Amino acid sequence: MLVDKYPVTNAEYQDFLRKSNWIPDLDVNWLRDWNAENGSFPDGFESKPVVWLSHQDATFYCNYYGKRLPHSWEWQWFAQGPDGRPYPWGYEDPDETRIPKFTNGRQHPPADNVDAHPLGASWCGIEDLVGNVYQWTDVFTDEHTSRAVLRGSPHWRPSGSHWYQPFPNTALSEHNTYLLMSEGMDRNGGTGFRCVQDV
C-alpha cells in the first residue's frame, strides 16, 4: 500500500477540480472558505489541508486518481507503527515543533501548512497526522445510521465547547466517530483527508 505523505492540499484539490470539472450534487458548505465566484482559495492557503469537504467529496477525489481513503486500522498502522508508540513521532510529549499551536475561540483559524512540522512525522515518514485537522477514514453503516471514523485531531476547539473533544487529543489510541447526516451537514472546517493506493 502506498500512502500520501501529506493530507490533500487546497492547491491539489483545485488542480483536481480543473481536470475533472467535478461539482457535487449538493454543494451546501462545499469549500466554504474558497471564493465561490472564481473557484479560488484564499491567498496563502496553497499548502494548507483542504477542508469543507464531505466524506463523499473526499472519496470521489481519491477514486479519480485510482486511490481510496484509508481504513481506520491502516491509518493507525502508518501513524503508530509496530511499536505501539503514543504519538506518530514516538514517546515525547507534543510541542509546537511537532504539531500546530492549539487555539480555542469563536473564530476558526486556518490550519497550518501540511509540511510545517516535519518533526511530527511517523515511523515511516508520513506527516501531518495529528494536531492540524481530523482525517476521514472508514464509514460504518447499519439499518438506521452511518458513521465515519475520524483519525488525527484538529488544532482548534470552539469556545465553551468542552464536550467537543479533549485537547490536545493527539494520542494515537484515540479517535472520534462522526454521524453522517447529509453532505452539506458533514462538511466542516476541521476535517481533511489523505489517500492511499493499493499496489
Identify what each model region corresponds to.
Residues G189-V199:
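Short, structured beta-strand segments at or near domain termini in extracellular proteins/domains
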Residues E12, D57-F60, R194:
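Short amphipathic alpha-helical face segments that pack within enzyme cores
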Residues A36-T177, G184, G189:
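Functional-site microenvironments in short loops/helix caps that host divalent-cation chemistry
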